[in-house]
Design a protein with these regions (language model features):
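N-terminal phosphate-binding or glycine-rich loops at protein starts, especially the Walker A/P-loop
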Residues: 1-34
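Short, charged/polar "capping" segments at the starts of alpha-helices
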Residues: 17-18, 43-49
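Glycine-rich, highly charged phosphate/nucleotide-binding loops
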Residues: 52-75, 93-98
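Structural motif
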Residues: 10-14, 41-42, 78-81, 85-88
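Alpha-helical segments flanking ligand/cofactor-binding loops in enzyme cores
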Residues: 24, 102-103
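ADP-ribose/adenylate-binding Rossmann-like module
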Residues: 104-112
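Short internal beta-strands
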Residues: 34-42, 111-112
């Protein structure tokens, strides 16, 4: 199966919470994208698999969209997508999340 591209998973402030279940699935089982990084400033500098399961999986957690894009580029996986990995209460992204999405669009990332 052909991948749709390389993705940054957006999960700011929620990666290791129930609201981050979408991100958990993407990190553990994604077949649609190659996951290049997870964005959650609370766990920046850690490995996503280590945060979730105590087992490193080679996916870095970073603190910002710009950092995620650069990290992906440095790993030879230039990001093509920002995938929303949070499901906030009420289903609406907060103001800072919407600003992050706008920055991702400005960086020519597809948002899913």
């Amino acid at each position: 199966m052909k991948l749709d591209g390389n993705a940054i998973v957006y999960c700011e402030g929620a990666f290791n919470t129930l609201n981050g279940k979408t991100a958990h699935g993407l990190v553990r089982f994604c077949r649609r994208y190659a996951i290049a990084a997870v964005m959650d400033s609370r766990y920046s500098g850690r490995d996503a698999g280590d945060v979730l399961d105590g087992k490193a999986g080679g996916i870095p957690v970073v603190d910002a969209i710009e950092t995620a894009k650069q990290t992906a580029e440095n790993a030879g996986m230039p990001a093509t997508h920002l995938v929303i990995g949070i499901a906030p209460d009420g289903g609406r992204l907060g103001k800072s999340a919407r600003q992050d999405v706008i920055r991702a669009i400005d960086m020519n990332l597809n948002v899913d």
